[in-house]
Amino acid sequence: MASNKINSLVARNTENAPKSIGPYSQTVAFSHYNNLSAQLPIDPKSGKIVAGGVKEQTEQCFKNIKAILESIDHVMNDVVRITVFVKNIKDVDTVDEVYKTFFPTYVPTRTTVAVAALPLNALVQIEALVSNGEGTIPNAPQAGNLIKLINNTANAPICSLSAQTVSFSHYNNLSAQLPIDPKTGRLITGGVKEQAQQCLKNIKAILNSIDVPFDDIVKINIFLKNLSDIEDVDEVYATFFPDSAIARAVAYVPARTIVAVSDLSMHALVQIEAVVSHGDGTPPQAIEDRHGIVINANNTENAPKNSLSTQTVAFSHYNHISAQLPIDPKTGKMIAGGVKEQAEQCLKNIKAILESISHGMEDVVKVNIFLKNITDSELVDEVYTTFFPGGIPARRTVGVSALQNDALIQIDVVVSNAEGTPLKA
């Protein structure tokens, strides 16, 4: 492959959206996707949170997303997935009213969770993943004529404000699934085990409806009301992954992130989101080309291992890394020290994973930071800038009520994969 045909990271910022409150870009495009930093309800003119309640704040978040998209010649209809973080789950109805005005006809996939804290004491923070049909090969824009495929099936819960699945190019994003029985539209009865099973059943039903195998999932995000329920969820999880005989033969499990939330819609105990490889592509990409792309899953001894998640799962031009806790891979235990030392260990683990697959921190497109104390952001940034001196990747920071191992911080990343994942001869 000629070097001039390789995608490169394109980080961009506009004056029409708030200046980042940390070392990160507003949007980073790579190949067929644009990863936006989570937007806070900041007025770009004043640099402060807008006056008013959750309605005004939601409006401002979406205005900021729209301004970023317009600055890169994109529109709201190019949004593939929206993630809404609220401080209070009761505010979701108000958020929805505003949401409809920005997505009057087409609706992307969506995840909504209530978290313990948001930067600047905001009531809402909204993040968008956006299609990028023109690609990012320097001086060689593609036709930009790829289309999104939107699907809904009656075999999974249907929502008027979100699509169950939106495919674009070689990825498929699913709306986070709640433990809703699609027949009744209500939460199923039972505890967290039954709920986790229903979430995964719903994901399976959505994938079945578009002829995509369950093992094509590359990344799973689990949102838990009580972090102590993780063992029960894991018990159910292990019955779903690996799914096929082929996946079992290689013990394939997707990359994974576990997030403690303060509340979920319908007061569910668990909600699960999936990112899926989509070998068929979307028109005009040819379906038969799928045979040339495979999932590459890797683990290294130099980072903490987990039997229920792979450290890095690459497919096509992206690489998904499991959330890293401040665990020393040599001892398998949490390192000593405060949030700075912990942030450094998380980033060291990420770096070790990337180096094991011949990548580096400069390939990171997006960083997700989960903090026990949102006020630790500045301390984290002191360490963060030593790993990302240019402050290039897009970023999202949320405050969580708890982290596994009583950690103070957890970090996961999305990474560019310029070489793709061709079938090895």
Predicted regions and their residues:
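N-terminal presequence-like segments and the immediate start of the first folded domain
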Residues: M1-K63, A67-V80, V86-K201, A205-K219, ...
